[in-house]
C-alpha cells in the first residue's frame, strides 16, 4: 500500500483520535504525503467545496456552499456503513456539513459582511498565482475555526523550468515571479496567524516548503535549468 509520510505521522503521533478536520489537501488531487489517509479532505478551494452537477444547480441560492436540498437527500442515500462505498459517502456528507456553514469569501462591508477578515494587515492578494494566496487564506481560516486540523498541504506548481527560466535583466523573470508569489503568500499567512485574536497561532504552527526534486546550478541551452540531485527546504 502507498501511504504518505504525513499519514504515517498522524497515525503515530499519539494525538486524540477524534477531531472534526484532522487533515486537508488543497489542490486538484490529494498530496502524495497524505495518501492512504481516510481522514484527509481534498479540495481545490474551500469556497467551492460542494456537490454540483444537478439540474439548474447554478441557480441554487446556496450554490457557493453546496446544494442544500441535494445534500439533505443524499444523507438518506448513504445512511449506512455496510460497504466501503457507503462509508465513504457518509464521510463526504459529514465533511460537507462541517464546511458548508463557513463563509470562506473575503470580507466586504456591503457584499459579504460575514466574510473572512485576515488579521494584522495580512494581504493574500499576490502579484502572481492568486490561487495560492486563496488556498493559504483558506488554511488560515480553518486553523482559526478550531476544527482540530493537524496538517494541511498545498501544491504550488510551475517550478519545472527546463526552458525559459527567466532573466531579470531582460524584464522577463519567470522564476523570480514564482519566488515572489511564494514569499508574499508565506508572509501573509505568517502575519495572519501570528496576529490572530485568540493569540499567536504561529507559535504552534510549523510551515515546511519542500520540492520533490532539486535543480542544477548551471543554465542549459534553453535558458532553463535541468533536474538536480540536491535540494533545500524552508521551515517557518
Regions found by a protein language model. Give the residues of each.
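Beta-strand elements within well-structured catalytic alpha/beta cores of enzymes
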Residues: 151-156, 206-212
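A structural signal for short secondary-structure junctions
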Residues: 146, 199-203, 225-229
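Residues at or immediately flanking beta-strands
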Residues: 23, 204-206
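Feature for exported/extracytoplasmic and membrane-associated proteins, marking the mature portion
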Residues: 1-183, 188-198, 218, 232-236
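Histidine-centered active-site microenvironments of extracellular/periplasmic hydrolases
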Residues: 211-236
Amino acid at each position: 500500500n502507498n501511504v504518505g509520510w504525513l499519514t504515517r505521522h498522524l497515525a503515530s503521533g499519539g494525538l486524540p483520535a477524534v477531531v472534526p478536520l484532522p487533515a486537508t489537501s488543497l489542490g486538484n488531487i490529494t498530496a502524495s504525503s497524505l495518501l492512504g489517509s481516510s481522514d484527509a479532505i481534498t479540495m481545490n478551494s474551500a469556497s467551492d467545496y460542494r456537490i454540483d452537477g444537478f439540474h439548474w444547480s447554478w441557480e441554487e441560492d446556496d450554490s457557493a456552499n453546496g446544494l442544500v436540498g441535494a445534500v439533505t437527500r443524499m444523507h438518506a442515500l448513504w445512511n449506512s456503513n455496510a460497504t466501503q462505498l457507503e462509508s465513504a459517502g457518509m464521510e463526504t456528507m459529514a465533511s460537507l456539513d462541517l464546511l458548508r456553514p463557513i463563509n470562506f469569501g473575503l470580507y466586504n462591508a456591503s457584499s459579504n459582511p460575514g466574510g473572512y477578515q485576515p488579521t494584522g494587515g495580512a494581504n493574500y492578494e499576490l502579484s502572481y498565482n492568486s490561487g495560492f494566496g486563496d488556498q493559504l487564506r483558506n488554511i488560515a481560516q480553518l486553523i482559526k475555526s478550531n476544527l482540530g486540523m493537524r496538517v494541511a498541504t498545498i501544491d504550488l506548481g510551475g517550478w519545472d523550468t527546463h526552458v525559459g527560466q527567466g532573466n531579470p535583466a531582460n524584464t522577463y523573470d519567470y522564476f523570480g515571479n514564482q519566488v515572489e508569489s511564494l514569499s508574499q503568500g508565506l508572509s501573509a499567512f505568517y502575519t495572519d496567524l501570528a496576529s490572530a485574536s485568540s493569540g499567536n497561532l504561529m507559535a504552534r504552527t510549523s510551515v515546511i516548503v519542500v520540492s520533490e526534486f532539486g535543480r542544477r546550478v548551471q543554465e542549459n541551452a534553453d535558458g532553463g535549468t535541468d533536474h538536480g540531485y540536491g535540494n533545500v527546504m524552508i521551515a517557518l
